From Swiss-Prot:
GO term, biological process aspect, one: translation
Pfam families documented for this protein: Ribosomal_L3 (PF00297)
Subunit and partners: Part of the 50S ribosomal subunit. Forms a cluster with proteins L14 and L19.
Family to which the UniProt record says this protein belongs: Belongs to the universal ribosomal protein uL3 family.
Entry annotated with the keyword rRNA-binding: yes
PANTHER family hit by this protein: 50S RIBOSOMAL PROTEIN L3, LARGE RIBOSOMAL SUBUNIT PROTEIN UL3C
Organism of origin: Chlorobium phaeovibrioides (strain DSM 265 / 1930)
Name by which UniProt lists this protein: Large ribosomal subunit protein uL3
Record InterPro entries: Ribosomal_uL3, Ribosomal_uL3_bac/org-type, Transl_B-barrel_sf
Function, in words: One of the primary rRNA binding proteins, it binds directly near the 3'-end of the 23S rRNA, where it nucleates assembly of the 50S subunit.
Length: 209
């Protein structure tokens, strides 16, 4: 079992024993440190708050700078909370979180923010088919069509699929296999793709299966 934060570096391929090309995502999982220990008695639940990376103090707000100094670690780029059951042993503020907590072949889930694509129509955003391409049609090729009734129900229902901002959603990809771990450089390689662009931050958590 393990949990850690990481930065998506990019994708590559590795070859397995059958000489098959396996697409992999390279994630820089560290340096990570525990920035706060939350307990049920004080906070209402048990969790470890983990930070990643080292940032200039001038780039961090004063409240967050004091938060990091209290833990005795350098300011990071982001923090996230993980359940204490995801870690072996008891950790304290300032404890390092290492990529060695994972094993090769293990199944993990990765959570990140997907690429933002801006305003998109219904064809791109919701896979609508659009209007027919014949019989005098001129401007309905990618139109959404009807969005509601007339006098009944006299409204458009919430959740109706329309054009709008696409992407920038929190996405969790499950059942990804850990292909390779490189502790000396804090790298972890998982089979397949993970959400987000290059240099975006992701959460990696072992599955309980």
């Amino acid at each position: 079992m393990g949990a850690i934060l990481g930065k998506k570096i990019g994708m590559t391929r590795l070859y397995n024993e059958k000489r098959e090309a396996v697409p992999c995502t390279i994630i820089q999982a560290g340096p990570c440190f525990v920035t706060q220990v939350k307990s049920a008695g004080i906070d209402g639940y048990d969790a470890y708050q983990v930070g990643i990376g080292e940032r200039k103090e001038a780039k961090v707000t004063k409240p967050m700078l004091g938060h990091y100094k209290k833990a005795g670690v350098a300011p990071g780029y982001m923090t996230a909370e993980f359940d204490t059951s995801m870690f072996d042993g008891e950790l304290t503020a300032g404890s390092p979180v290492l990529v060695e907590s994972f094993t090769e072949g293990e199944i993990v889930k990765v959570q990140g923010v997907s690429k933002g694509k801006g305003f998109a129509g219904v064809v791109k955003r919701h896979n609508f088919g659009g209007g027919q391409r014949t019989h005098g049609q001129s401007d309905r090729l990618r139109a959404p069509g009807s969005i509601g009734g007339a006098s009944d129900p006299s409204k458009t229902f919430k959740g109706t699929k329309m054009g709008g901002r696409m992407g920038s959603d929190t996405i969790t990809v499950r059942n990804l296999q850990v292909i390779k771990i490189m502790p000396e450089s804090s790298l972890i390689m998982v089979k397949g793709s993970v959400p987000g662009p290059k240099n975006s931050y992701v959460r990696i958590v072992s599955t309980k299966k």
